[in-house]
Amino acid sequence: EGARKIPVIAEVDLVVAGGSSRAIAAAVAAAKTGSRVYLVGYMPYLGEDICGSHLYEREAGEKLQTALARKLFPGKNFPTPLHIKKTLEDELIDNNVQFLYSSYVTNVLTDPSGKPAGVVIANRSGRQAIRCKAIIDATHNASVTGLLGAERKPFIAGSQEFCYTVVGNTPKEAPEIIQAEELSQPIKVGEKSYPVTRYTFHLPLKDDSYASLAEVEQIIRNRTWDIDQVDSSDLLWYIPKQTINSEKAYNGNPVSWRKLPMQAFKSKNIANLWVLGPCAEIPRELAAKVMRPVPALFIGEMMGETVARQIKDIPVPAQATVRQLKVNASNYGQTGELLSPLRPSLQKGFVDSPAGALPVLGSYDVVVMGGGTAGASAGISAAKQGANTLVLEYLHGLGGLSTLGMIGVYWDGFRGGYTAHIDKSVLAMAPKDHPRQPKGEGRFPADWKMEWHRKELLQAGGKLWFGVMGCGALIEGSQVKGVVVATPFGRGVILSKILIDSTGSADIAIAAGAAFDYTGKKTIAVQGAGTGKWAPGDYYNNNDWLFVDDTDILDVSRAFVQAKTKLQGQYDLVKIPQTRERRRVIGDYIISVYDVINHRRYPDTISYHKSSFDTHGMIIDPLFILNPPEKRHKIYDADVPLRCLLPKGLEGILTTGLGASAHRDAMPVIRMQPCLQNQGYAVGYLSALCVKENKSPRKIDIKKVQRHLVKIGNLPERVLTDKEFKGFSNSEMKKAIASVTDNYKGLEILLTDPERCIQLASKQIAGATMPE
């Protein structure tokens, strides 16, 4: 990684890393003393311990000793996820604590003496720095502590205890399950009641890599799922065996939580660094008790007050640079990323990041970044063709907006081909008379579809990591050789022969240097979006009530805050903004509105689409300004060529879905879920073929790919003989000019070639005579 400058977005007294309830308690307690505090959470919600690991119950003897604890657990019944998330969020807002969702701490800043001076975070907007005096590391595995080089006990491979909670189904048995406890209260939503089962597993943890934890997570999901399940933990709950080396280890059993010495939570060799998590140097049995939400809220509050007092008179370091390890490394290429300031008003200068190296977390034939509507299909397809495939997904389920986004009902779209296979297979997971079988076509229970994708991928030999965000690309010249990722364990590189960018907004292609188009520079037009409600068993809560740029982390965080107010009283909300427009890569070809309306054909068609112009807002193409679609729901069929999925100037990478190369007003016709599932399959198949034949996507025999796609029903047979469109003839243009005064008939032909249109129209006007 070459030297670079990281934009600074804030300067505060204290950074709290992590979005657990204990992290919020510490941040608020520090803020109440007058400290300026910034909290960074990597999930799209707060309370990752309670909501993420499903710890809504209080154990016997857990007393609500803080005001925040009493707000979170107001009665005997389990609180709802939305209550937890909004209560914690309100605490931060009411006490002027700045915070961001969906952001990973990837690096730390240090002053010239090596003391902490801030953090670097990664999110959909790129990477930014926050300067500070001190850090509370409230991550589950003390990952920030590791970035600073704090001493810790060595990792010992072996059996580890994991807890995982499911809602709705019956307890399962397996050799790895040592306990399956049905909790005292079911989850009640309206008139429905769902049992809750907490499993305890004993499973081997091979090493301290994120890959090993991801493997354990998939094993646990395999052992516990059935068709009656309506919810489950996002995050495994476990107490790591490895602890930090603290100022003073604590080996006792305190008579009260207040007696816990803060020295056991403070790093031994790094000043101004505290650990508020299970990696504190206390007995593992004690950590299992005090890191549960209720006790941890008390400890967090105590730590926030203590740290704020200790750093009150310390200045923010005048000099700060990104800490880079001095290591021997292989030169696979350079990392590309986004390093633009979030807002002009937030710009606080830059910090230097010296040249350094990133760990290689794995090497695969095909890597799919994003397991959404297209990405899940792409991963399954590549794996089924024998490619060594890894799918990386930020959320803890596959399917994206079609599942976790609660858009579980098709609108338009071509439903043949691989999509027909998905649809039939998902509904076949349960008997036809199962009470959750949907009424009507094109409807799919979200958790069934998520599980179908997951099992199909794993059964095909693919690997799956949840909780991972793409934050850059590894490039050598014009060749993309891998993806830079942020995980809860830190930042690293995953090498690929072919990288499929299924982020939905071409995040990785843009980080690699690809040009893109989006709202802002030319127009303020953006399609309407939503952030809908969710409750167990739901699969369709589509809505359109806000505008949001889901590549702007400030805007996304704002949308989640706004949604919680709008949805007060609901059980929960979605974990992904329901957006319809995102960044679109500039590919070898850009699909226009005229291509769609004129049914343009291509020799390299990769996916077939059917939809209306489902625009949800302002349109900007001159054709629509003059002649908007007359019928609300007229269906157009459109081809998408491979060229639109190939970022211009880059090799070894393809983009899918909403990140494809198309005009914003053409995108509504080619973004329907059924079509994108087919597109994902096609891209996965093509990528695996590229690996087998050692060819780039531009060099592959597209007819070979098309023949397979025609065979399975993805493409109409005509694509095998379709020719390149050479443009409309002069006679066709003249005919269109003659008819354009009749309610703009032929305008879609004329606007394909504005210069020729003007020439021919000018001649006709010059030769016209005024009627007497």
Write out the residue ranges for each language-model feature.
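Beta1/beta-strand and adjacent pyrophosphate-binding region of the FAD-binding site
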Residues: 6-20, 358-372
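Structural detector for internal amphipathic alpha-helices that build alpha-solenoid repeat scaffolds
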Residues: 736, 741-753, 759-772
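Second-shell loop/turn segments in exported
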Residues: 15, 55, 73-78, 131, ...
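Conserved beta-strand elements of the Class I
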Residues: 13-15, 38, 367, 390, ...
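Flavin (FAD/FMN)-binding glycine-rich loop and adjacent Rossmann-like elements that form
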Residues: 3-6, 49, 61-62, 101, ...
